[in-house]
Amino acid sequence: QLRGGTGIFTGNIPFVWFTNMPTNAGVIQNTFEPVSSSVLAKIDHFEADPNFWPNALPENFPKTPSTKAPGGLALIDPDFKMPQIWRSNFGVDFKVPSTPLVLTGDVIYSKDLNGVMQYNVNRNPATQKLAYSGDNRDYWGSSANAKFNKNTSLNNIVPLLTNTDEGYSLSATIGANINNVRGFSAGVFYSYTESKDITGNPGSSASSAWSNNYSVNDPNESLIGLSQYAVPNRVGGNLSYRVEYAGFLATTIGLY
């Protein structure tokens, strides 16, 4: 028996990476929690007009920054696309003649079409390299022209949510199983996986998804490497026993 298929699949991302942008937009934002009895006394009715309370309580809703605009920014590439992969699979099952044994094999290949990654647009390239034996990593000096940030009035990390198409994975599985031989069923399988990507986006926010990436010099290198979620070699098995009784009842005990 042969089986297989191919297709393009689209998914979602953690939506916090979208909400990072409006909440870190570099404009004045204010969270107001009334605790003073004098302020609470003024809030005596519901008002649908969103501009009413900021105008009625100007001391609690500042309209101009006291020093400078907030330094936190999170950006989204105007051409950003939701994650999309091309995936193909092929499988074969072969029943060994005159035995209950079935041999099976499967191959799955996936290729990123629109992978998701974060890029720090406020990162200056390094100006120097270490000169130790076997260690030539980049580093940032202490001179005025060797600043880590392009714009020092902003935070160290200004993440840009964008796409990459460099990731892929290949998984192959072989196995053998028997089904319901005097109530017994069993199987054993081996899987090999090679999976590489630019990033696994290991963070709950845009900045942590960038800064938590493993890298030699800095996460902006965007070098393809082994996926942190890949399991290269895996062996699995199962064993179960089914007993029928009372004409219409059955109990199965399984071990995986």
List the model feature ranges, each with a label.
Residues 1-160:
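Solvent-exposed loop/turn elements at secondary-structure boundaries
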